[in-house]
């Protein structure tokens, strides 16, 4: 950029930064090429056109714009190409785009994207119209022609070319498929070779330009557009057309070269004070401006050589990662408007373009090789002498156990595999295994070469460690036996304490009949744990209030030769049950949330539900009415009553 005028003449230079890439990839540097296209004046009949134009072209590479700080000065910009308002679509395509297409046939990536404010003509540059086709139809037509010409060349007799297309839009930070709209946000991923891809996106094979038209025209109608004060058909999303060219070899080693062409029509930055956006238009504008701001941050980070490039801060920059500082031949067509009302939008676009042309990419060919795996040849088994052969193998096996390890290693070393017939992954694993075995063999050799005195010391130390382990195991068994005996004594003492307690026969009745010892499985009998204590039970008995009554005695027929094992079921006294229900009912009708939560199995949610039901339907008539509440069954009410009555007795 150069400032010119009667008072000042100054030149400003921009810093350069080479993008970082994997060191093993040998590539040539390719700077991002920037072209600027000036849109024609919208109203040709405007008499004030001469005074309202703020941009003027100087030659085929430079232009000047009025300095807003000083109207007597102009700022000059120089780019790779400048196209005035009279330039045709063909001139722009032939001058800036067509030269990058041959790179696709050798497995390299390329990208062309249109940048600029809203209403500056980006979509017209990329799409055009039937009379003046834009960059996209011209590039696809030439690419199809180039692939047919290359396929018919004698040196490419064993090669085939296939071309696929995908078409997506980035609308409000969502990647949407335009070929088959699914209203689904597609993810953006990066493979092990640092290639950006979109899993699940629709791909269509195209063999002719008619196939391309058949898929592209309906998909373009699916793109989101709307009307604003500055543009009747304003793009509300970033559109990305991906053309993938694959060159495949039909003979060994089956090489495959893959080149990708990104044709990107960016949505324009918008000043909502001038566009009058409201509602959904305002939300769309915010998403567009945010992604373009992230794009400017990426360019600044590349120029300043920052360690972190914010590609992942936006779906747009993530998708453009190959185009800016990556591995693609990139061309940016900056569209600007000449009107004075677009002055600051034009100035911002020119500054962004000046920074972008300093970015340097490192393109390289994407090549893969497929290895044919031949089936392993099996030796036919001899029918005669089979028994003798097996005996011979057994004898050789016994002999090998008596021989030294070195002899076995020598025998294994004589058997060699034909690595050329194996899968590369298998070969790699075999080489790693061979390396491990070699290292282990060296360690064994070192052990055998150890002096006799040191070897005897090592063996003695090993025997001592084994004896120590055995001693620790015996000690552990003794400790376990003592622990089991202590537990048995404790259980016996607890049972004797329970038998000596003053619990009367009328209060608790337990089966006291003798039992024959047997290995048959007997029914479990309820017992009181020691930690519950005897004081509470004894105090209850001393008051003369029996808590449980014997309900019914049942006998169960056991295995033959055994006595019948009696079992008991306990039934709670009716007066205690009724008094407990009255206490619970009173608390249900008068208690607060905190008081209700003191009941067993009543939490915050159920307590609020009880109070709400009480306010609508009045007090509960009985506790069983809890089953009328939503989410509480009659079975839950029964267990709730038992739990609270037992809790009151225990307390």
Curated annotation (Swiss-Prot):
Keyword Nucleotide-binding: yes
Matching SUPFAM superfamilies: P-loop containing nucleoside triphosphate hydrolases, RuvA domain 2-like
Compositionally biased intervals (Polar residues): 401-410
Location (main, coarse): nucleus
PROSITE patterns: KINESIN_MOTOR_1 (PS00411), KINESIN_MOTOR_2 (PS50067)
Keywords: ATP-binding, Coiled coil, Cytoplasm, Cytoskeleton, DNA-binding, Microtubule, Motor protein, Nucleotide-binding, Nucleus, Ubl conjugation
Sequence positions that bind ATP: 116-123
PTM notes: Ubiquitinated, leading to its subsequent proteasomal degradation.
Motif mapping: Important for regulated proteolytic degradation: 561-564
Resulting phenotype, residue 563 to A: Reduces regulated proteolytic degradation
MF-aspect GO terms: ATP binding; ATP hydrolysis activity; DNA binding; microtubule binding; microtubule motor activity
SMART domains attached to this UniProt entry: KISc
Record carries keyword Glycosyltransferase: no
Any one annotated GO CC term: microtubule
Chain positions covered by the region annotation Disordered: 366-413
Superkingdom of this protein's organism: Eukaryota
Kinesin motor domain boundaries: 31-359
Location(s), subcellular: Nucleus; Cytoplasm, Cytoskeleton
InterPro entries: Kinesin-like_fam, Kinesin_motor_CS, Kinesin_motor_dom, Kinesin_motor_dom_sf, P-loop_NTPase, RuvA_2-like
Swiss-Prot/TrEMBL GO biological process terms: microtubule-based movement; mitotic spindle organization; spindle elongation
Function recorded in the entry: Kinesin family member that is involved in spindle formation and the movements of chromosomes during mitosis and meiosis. Binds to microtubules and to DNA.
Protein family membership: Belongs to the TRAFAC class myosin-kinesin ATPase superfamily. Kinesin family.
Protein name, per record: Kinesin-like protein KIF22-A
Organism of origin: Xenopus laevis (African clawed frog)
């Amino acid at each position: 950029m150069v400032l010119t005028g009667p008072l000042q003449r100054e030149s400003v230079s921009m810093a350069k930064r080479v993008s970082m890439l994997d060191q093993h990839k040998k590539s040539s540097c390719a700077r991002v090429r920037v072209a600027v296209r000036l849109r024609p004046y919208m109203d040709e009949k405007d008499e004030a056109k001469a005074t309202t134009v703020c941009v003027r072209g100087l030659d085929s590479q430079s232009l000047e714009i009025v300095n807003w700080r000083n109207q007597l000065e102009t700022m000059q910009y120089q780019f790779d190409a400048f196209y005035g308002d009279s330039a045709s679509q063909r001139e722009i395509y032939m001058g800036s785009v067509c030269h990058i297409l041959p790179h696709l046939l050798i497995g390299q990536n390329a990208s062309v994207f249109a940048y600029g404010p809203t209403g500056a003509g980006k979509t017209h540059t990329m799409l055009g119209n039937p009379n003046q086709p834009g960059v996209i139809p011209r590039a696809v037509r030439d690419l199809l022609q180039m692939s047919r010409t290359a396929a018919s060349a004698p040196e490419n007799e064993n090669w085939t070319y296939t071309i696929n297309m995908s078409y997506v839009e980035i609308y409000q930070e969502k990647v949407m498929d335009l070929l088959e709209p699914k209203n689904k946000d597609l993810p953006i991923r990066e493979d092990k070779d640092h290639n950006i891809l979109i899993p699940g996106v629709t791909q269509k094979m195209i063999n002719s330009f008619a196939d391309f038209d058949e898929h592209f025209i309906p998909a373009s109608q699916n793109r989101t557009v709307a009307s604003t004060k500055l543009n009747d058909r304003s793009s509300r999303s970033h559109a990305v057309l991906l053309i993938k060219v694959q060159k495949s070899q039909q003979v060994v080693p089956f090489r495959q070269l893959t080149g990708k062409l990104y044709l990107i029509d960016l949505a324009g930055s918008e000043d909502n004070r001038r566009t009058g956006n409201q509602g959904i238009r305002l939300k769309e504008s915010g998403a567009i401006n945010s992604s373009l701001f992230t794009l400017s941050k990426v360019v600044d980070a590349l120029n300043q050589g920052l360690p972190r490039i914010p590609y992942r801060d936006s779906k747009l920059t993530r998708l453009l990662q190959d185009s800016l500082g990556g591995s693609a031949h990139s061309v940016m067509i900056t569209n600007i408007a000449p009107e004075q009302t677009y002055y600051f939008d034009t100035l911002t676009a020119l500054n962004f373009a000046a920074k972008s042309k300093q970015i340097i990419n490192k393109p390289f060919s994407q090549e893969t090789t497929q290895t044919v795996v031949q089936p392993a040849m099996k030796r036919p088994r001899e029918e005669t002498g089979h028994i003798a052969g097996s005996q011979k193998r057994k004898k050789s096996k016994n002999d090998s156990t008596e021989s030294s390890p070195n002899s076995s290693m020598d025998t294994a070393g004589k058997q060699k595999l034909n690595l050329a017939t194996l899968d590369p992954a298998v070969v790699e694993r075999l080489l790693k295994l061979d390396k491990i075995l070699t290292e282990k063999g060296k360690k064994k050799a070192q052990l055998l070469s150890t002096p006799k005195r040191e070897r005897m010391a090592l063996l003695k130390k090993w025997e001592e460690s084994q004896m120590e382990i055995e001693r620790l195991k015996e000690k552990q068994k003794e400790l376990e036996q003592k622990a089991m005996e202590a537990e048995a004594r404790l259980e016996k003492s607890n049972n004797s304490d329970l038998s000596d307690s003053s619990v009367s026969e009328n209060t608790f009745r337990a089966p006291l009949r003798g039992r024959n010892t047997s290995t048959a499985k007997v029914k479990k009998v309820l017992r009181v744990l020691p930690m519950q204590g005897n004081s509470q039970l004894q105090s209850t008995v001393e008051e003369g209030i029996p808590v449980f009554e014997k309900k019914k005695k049942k006998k169960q027929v056991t295995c033959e030769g055994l006595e019948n094992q009696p079992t008991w079921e306990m039934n709670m006294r009716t007066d205690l049950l009724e008094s407990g229900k009255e206490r619970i009912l009173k608390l249900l009708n008068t208690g607060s949330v905190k008081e209700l939560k003191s009941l067993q199995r009543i939490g915050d949610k159920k307590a609020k539900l009880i109070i709400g039901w009480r306010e609508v339907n009045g007090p509960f008539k009985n506790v069983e009415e809890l089953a009328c509440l939503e989410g509480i069954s009659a079975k839950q009410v029964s267990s709730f009553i038992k739990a609270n009555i037992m809790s009151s007795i225990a307390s």
